[in-house]
UniProtKB/Swiss-Prot annotation:
Its EC number is 2.4.1.18. Catalyzes the formation of the alpha-1,6-glucosidic linkages in glycogen by scission of a 1,4-alpha-linked oligosaccharide from growing alpha-1,4-glucan chains and the subsequent attachment of the oligosaccharide to the alpha-1,6 position. InterPro entries: A-amylase/branching_C, Branching_enzy, GlgB, GlgB_N, GlgB_N_E_set_prok, Glyco_hydro_13_cat_dom, Glyco_hydro_13_N, Glyco_hydro_b. CDD domains: AmyAc_Glg_BE, E_set_GBE_prok_N. NCBIfam families: branching_enzym, PRK05402.1, PRK12313.1. This is 1,4-alpha-glucan branching enzyme GlgB. It comes from the Bacteria. One of its GO terms (biological process) is glycogen biosynthetic process. Pathway: Glycan biosynthesis; glycogen biosynthesis. Keywords: Carbohydrate metabolism, Glycogen biosynthesis, Glycogen metabolism, Glycosyltransferase, Transferase.
Length: 728
């Protein structure tokens, strides 16, 4: 005789309110034999089938017209593989029963996930194609410890939450289920009854692909193969390397002219990659490409942290783009957003009816500036989700570096908050200790697991040791954006030259703290939006002076210690602010040769010259690599310094930030001899006035500026020149 199933249990199963489906469904030992139970809505007949022979072993009785079937296979005591022949609407289908498979997640994996120390949680959680007991399908697993019931719904089950309720692994709070026949390319979500009894539909936090907005389903998709970083790519990230970064928003770099639609990943591989290579950049930095619902967030409010956006193509198309960049000798940096996530119902917000990924108190868990939620870094599973994501992009896509967004908002509890709007840490301070530990741990793990890849911090305060090792009290980043340098120098450049003498320190101050961090000098997307104007439009004067100022500024920037970053459009002096809904103004480069061509040629020459001469990059973070020659000539707004490599070779950099040419300008130098002008931002090649020094100048044994030898130069108006000493 079979074990009678309580009517309340059947009702709960059919209503989708039963939390332990494996205790009822599937094959079970009873006093009468092996009993098979199945919930198959809309089925009319069900048989248990012997797979090898196709023989019908037993017919299941319909105990509830809503689809609950049960039947006993007499004289059988040991579990065996079986299939179900199910008649739906007059058609017989042979299926494998999901409830005949045992637990999916190994005990060690479950323990590591609960401890938050699983290096690669994405290998266990999410949707993974698999073969179990000879049956192909997909195993699903999702962390939702407070949900009352979780089901997988998708194209394989008519989005019906009754058909595939999952098993809860109570020790870890993870729900799991293997669904035979579910395959790559099919859409799915998790349907759950949350902690409050509400029905929710959630996309998979670990989905490797997702639908493009406005749709929100996840896609079953295989885990990408690992990508090994080559030695060349590792060297290109090092502190002594020439690093010149072209920052790009893929959706607006260039668009189709007929319909203003985006270029695909593959089209970008064919157009953007060779352009960046031709321009002499060493790295491409991509604004976030994680799936996100709102175009206007530029990707900085992601909902699919493991899924490249489908706006530009498939996951494999994105890998094609990265491969093309690597083949062209370009490293790829990905903007990464572990600081916050949007409030959209389909994603992480109140995932299982509780504040699972975020803090429950809005003073800790809500960003007022962006209407987003803040990760609870103190919850081990949450920090594991994020650390694993960093490793995922590097290992599985070949990303060479991560630029971490909005670090200051993570490490300070009072970031952009008034008194009473934030909660102090356990010691009464303003630092977010859990976020600090998360960042240190992420950088430590990346250093251990993917040596050669690096991280960069956008950190807008003077928090000490952002790019210093953890054992020295630092956060462990390799590089930090120098936002102070950027603000000071742009504030200086926007001044009418007649007033610059009173703000000379805005150009000299940066060197005083230059060696406290490993700096990147950024002219990023943030500087050409929200009414700030374009970089060109911030320059003072008439059109000629605007372009001359910009060229002089770029010459100064590429010579100053620190790695370089330039947002797209700035390389040809786009006059408008950036618009994420439109292409860059490439028409400025159409027709006859003009000032925009001149700036573009200058940036290319700056990149190539900077890369060629080790003195310009080898000792960016060593005081030996820089020395002032003229630092105090405020009245004429002239600054001169040398850059130096490890062998002592020097390059002289001289800037004149007034429109007055300075003839016979004498200054002391360290190394006498013949000096050749290798770059002049006032060259006619760049549409300047072509003032200069006729190629080479010889030093004189005339003391100046405390040095025995000196040079006498013509300093062109609103220009920067670079000189290298010729071999004897």
């Amino acid at each position: 005789m079979s074990d009678r199933i309580d009517r309340d249990v059947i009702n709960a199963l059919i209503a989708g309110h039963f939390a332990d489906p494996f205790s009822v469904l599937g094959m079970h030992k009873t006093t009468a034999g092996l009993e098979v139970r199945a919930l198959l809505p809309d089925a009319t007949d069900v048989w248990v089938i012997e797979p090898k022979t196709g023989r019908k072993l037993a017919k299941l009785e319909c105990l509830d017209s809503r689809g609950f079937f049960s039947g006993v296979i007499p004289r059988r005591k040991n579990f065996f593989r079986y299939q179900l022949a199910v008649v739906w609407h007059g058609q017989q289908n042979l299926i494998d029963d999901p409830y005949r498979f045992g637990p999916l997640i190994q005990e060690m994996d479950a323990w590591l996930l609960s401890e938050g120390t699983h290096l690669r949680p994405y290998e266990t959680l999410g949707a993974h194609a698999d073969t179990m007991d000879g049956v192909t399908g997909t195993r699903f697993s999702v962390w939702a410890p407070n949900a009352r019931r979780v089901s997988v719904v998708g194209q394989f089950n008519y989005w019906d939450g009754r058909r595939h309720p999952m098993r809860l692994r109570k020790e870890s709070g993870i729900w799991e289920l293997f669904i035979p026949g579910a395959h790559n390319g099919q859409l799915y979500k998790y349907e759950m009854i949350d902690a409050n009894g509400n029905l929710r539909l959630k996309s998979d936090p670990y989905a490797f692909e997702a639908q493009m907005r406005p749709e929100t389903a996840s896609l079953i998709c295989g885990l990408p193969e690992k990508v090994v970083q080559t030695e060349e790519r590792k060297k290109a990230n090092q502190f002594d390397a020439s690093i010149s970064i072209y920052e790009v928003h893929l959706g607006s770099w260039r668009r189709h002219t007929d319909n203003n639609f985006w270029l695909s990943y593959r089209e970008l591989a064919d157009q953007l990659v060779p352009y960046a290579k031709w321009m002499g950049f060493t790295h491409l930095e991509l604004l976030p490409i994680n799936e996100h619902p709102f175009d206007g967030s530029w990707g900085y409010q992601p909902t699919g942290l493991y899924a490249p956006t489908r706006r530009f193509g498939t996951r494999d198309d994105f890998r094609y783009f990265i491969d093309a960049a690597h083949a062209a000798g370009l490293n790829v940096i990905l903007d990464w957003v572990p600081g916050h996530f949007p409030t959209d119902d389909f994603a992480l917000a109140e995932f299982d009816g509780t504040n699972l990924y975020e803090h429950s108190d809005p003073r800790e868990g809500y960003h007022q500036d962006w209407n987003t939620l803040i990760y609870n870094y103190g919850r081990r599973e949450v920090s594991n989700f994020l650390v694993g994501n960093a490793l995922y992009w590097i290992e599985r896509f070949g990303i060479d570096a991560l630029r971490v967004d909005a670090v200051a908002s993570m490490i300070y509890r009072d970031y952009s908050r008034k008194e009473g709007e934030w909660i102090p840490n356990e010691f009464g301070g303003r630092e977010n200790l859990e976020a600090i530990e998360f960042l240190r741990n992420t950088n430590r793990i990346l250093g251990e697991q993917v040596s050669g890849a690096v991280t960069m911090a956008e950190e807008s305060t003077d928090f000490p040791g952002v790019s210093r090792p953890q054992d020295m009290g630092g956060l462990g980043f390799w590089y930090k954006w120098n936002l102070g340098w950027m603000h000071d120098t742009l504030d200086y450049m926007k001044l009418d030259p007649v007033y610059r003498q009173y703000h000379h320190d805005k150009l000299t101050f940066g060197i005083l703290y230059n060696y406290t961090e490993n700096f990147v000098l950024p002219l990023s997307h943030d500087e050409v939006v929200h009414g700030k104007k374009s970089i060109l439009d911030r320059m003072p004067g008439d059109a000629w002076q605007k372009f001359a100022n910009l060229r002089a500024y770029y010459g100064w920037m590429w010579a100053f210690p620190g790695k370089k970053l330039l947002f797209m459009g700035n390389e040809f002096a786009q006059g408008r602010e950036w618009n994420h809904d439109a292409s860059l103004d490439w028409h400025l480069l159409e027709g006859g040769d003009n000032w925009h061509h001149g700036v573009q040629r200058l940036v290319r020459d700056l990149n190539l010259t900077y890369r060629h001469h080790k003195a310009m990059h080898e000792l960016d973070f060593d005081p030996y690599g820089f020395e002032w020659l003229v630092v105090d000539d405020k009245e004429r707004s002239v600054l001169i310094f040398v850059r130096r490599d490890k062998e002592g070779n020097e390059i002289i950099v001289a800037s004149n930030f007034t429109p007055v040419p300075r003839h016979d300008y004498r200054f002391g130098i360290n190394q006498p001899g013949k000096w050749r002008e290798i770059l002049n931002t006032d060259s006619m090649h760049y549409h300047g006035s072509n003032a200069g020094n006729g190629g080479t100048v010889h030093s004189d044994e005339i003391a100046s500026h405390g040095r025995q030898h000196s040079l006498s130069l013509t300093l062109p108006p609103l220009a920067t020149i670079w000189l290298v000493r010729e071999a004897e």
